């Protein structure tokens, strides 16, 4: 065949180094092995020779040496091998590869071993797992025209590497500017007391929403994870006054909590006491109603007897009433036959808690003499008008005793 020989003097061979059909039928020996190696060498030289002709763009193959190799061919082969090998690259687990073809975005590649055609495609690895931080601070004006210094920390993560690299030129600077703008807007709509005290949590959430709305049209390829409102303090010139105001506010809150605790402790007792008084009043009302009804029944029973004999009935009622009155009072018995003068300290006697009733009955005169005061020396005792109106019966008894004493003196 034509591809098995360089010239007519060489035997016809096949490309796999085998002999022609006549030699295949014969036995193999050492000469066959040598011929086989020679055929392989000649085939490789022919391959290099043909490639050399392509690079040199000439059809005059008779002027070149059949056994000589062009060094440019070797350089080209090595360069091609290096170019292919240099196209391999590795993307880490936390990264994503952004592939560009002649500078234009092509696609994203996953973590692992990948290959790219060098000088045609470029790959830039972007970390999409690391949480990044951006800190900002500044002196800002509040709604009540006060100045406050604010510090804030923004945590974010890259979620779209292509947008992060190609949407804007400097995404981190754009995020910083959006954060400053959002923070100043929120602080400008809040008063200073709110910024320094109870409004910090609300300011943080409002600032995060404002940042997200600001960067959304620009497609920065990032996601805001958290916004930390770190420090807010007044200027040094008025710091002491604000500290006093904050301390006063804290004291007020403490007093309110103490008052609520005291109220929670006292109110149940007061409600219980009020309920007890109401129950006692209801019981007293019921008792008085029942007693009145009993009196009505009793008088209704006495009414027929009263109609029959008025004097006897009135006398009996008088005796019963006097029995009830005198059974709970102190009494003094005087012997009319004894004409000696009797002096009693009635004030001490009637206000005395305890006394010996047996001595009073056995020797009332001696008992009365033991008192140090008399009616003549004690103006307060002799003055009946000094007693309160509620002691009506006591006045009557004192007047009765004084009348008896005067009668004895006359005799």
Swiss-Prot record:
SUPFAM superfamilies assigned: Band 7/SPFH domain
Q: Does the keyword Protein biosynthesis apply?
A: no
Q: Region entry Disordered: which residue ranges?
A: 1-34
Tell where it localizes: Membrane
What Gene Ontology cellular-component terms does the record carry?
Answer: membrane
Keyword match Transmembrane: yes
Ordered alphabetically, the record's keywords are:
Membrane, Transmembrane, Transmembrane helix
* Basic and acidic residues bias spans: 15-34
Which Gene3D superfamilies does the record cross-reference, listed alphabetically? Band 7 domain
Q: Where is the composition biased (Polar residues)?
A: 1-10
Q: What are the TM regions of this chain, as residue ranges?
A: 71-91
Which Pfam family, just one, is annotated for this protein?
Answer: Band_7
How does the entry describe its membrane topology?
A: Single-pass membrane protein
What NCBIfam families does the entry give? hflK
- What family is it from? Belongs to the band 7/mec-2 family. HflK subfamily.
| Function of the molecule | HflC and HflK could encode or regulate a protease.
Record's subunit section? HflC and HflK may interact to form a multimeric complex.
Query: Would you tell me the protein name for this molecule?
Result: Protein HflK
